[in-house]
Amino acid sequence: MVDFGGWEMPLQYENGILKEHLGTRRYGGLFDVSHMGRFRIHGRDKIAFLQHVLSNDAESLNPWQAQYTLIPNNNGGLLDDAYLFRTGDEYFLVVNASNREKDWNHLHSHASSFDVSLEEQTENISMIAFQGPLTESILVKLLEGGSMPETSRNRLSEIMLAGTKIISARTGYTGEPLGFELFIPSEKVEDVWNCLYKAGSDEGILSVGLGARD
């Protein structure tokens, strides 16, 4: 275990970094990425606020879509990169763990000029990245309700898995053409992880640590 952005993270699991890397490319990998910061944004001026604090065009984002974006600082430099997700009328922003407090303070400093509310959801909502060629077929097999996201990258949907309502997004940082990030109530994340691992381990799915992810 190593410290990363104030979180204890597994550098690797029992298979080691190389096998975790190759396993993700060939079959699929399970990554606990709950250390990433998650902020919920809502309120009448949410779009105007997001247009003000982010570099990408948040207004162009349709429901159940996501986009990569940057958080500029007050001088036009870079504070952090982030991912913005839209479900229905709500938005949530995923930021880097090491910048979470700094990003939160920066966003709050601008929120007072808008009719908008920010909620810190990092501890309430956990994240699993499920990345690699076999991931979609495994998810489809386990699906208990809802439907998978549209096939284009950056699409979202709501699914039921392991008795839990989950937001599934076709996003991820591994470079794999097929992969998902799953947003899960924290009290249910262990159940979902175990369900995915049990279903995928016979097909080569591995738990993957920070070393292989980097």
PLM segments and residue spans:
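Glycine/proline-enriched, intrinsically flexible loops and inter-domain linkers
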Residues: 1-214
